[in-house]
Amino acid sequence: MINLQNKKLDIKEFLQELGFTVSLDYEREPMGVMFAEIHPIVSQVSNNSAIYQSFRTLEIELMVICTEETENSLYRAVQLLSDEHYIYANTITDNTNIIKLRGNYYD
């Protein structure tokens, strides 16, 4: 079973090492920074009646005051996280990118 708090902190540290400022509690920070949160969703997958696999989906919402360079860096950071992560929503309003990132972690 994955420890969600540790995974949240691992992703926070990873993004900070890439130069982003990360807030896990959506506090408003100075312009040009990133916010992140991870929401657990537990599901079960069954290929047949004998095989069950549970997985946990971690959803991260990132809010970035955006320049073209910042946006490109964010997409590169997402690609570095792992093959299990992908951006499934991207909304741009008033120079702010709101990007939702989803990844599966298998138990």
Curated annotation (Swiss-Prot):
UniProtKB keywords: Early protein
Top-rank taxon: Viruses
Stated role: Seems to be involved in escape from killing mediated by the bacterial type III toxin-antitoxin module AbiQ toxin protein upon infection of L.lactis subsp. lactis strain IL1403. A single variant independently isolated from 5 different phage confers on the virus the ability to partially escape killing (i.e. the virus grows in the bacteria).
Protein name (database record): Gene product 19
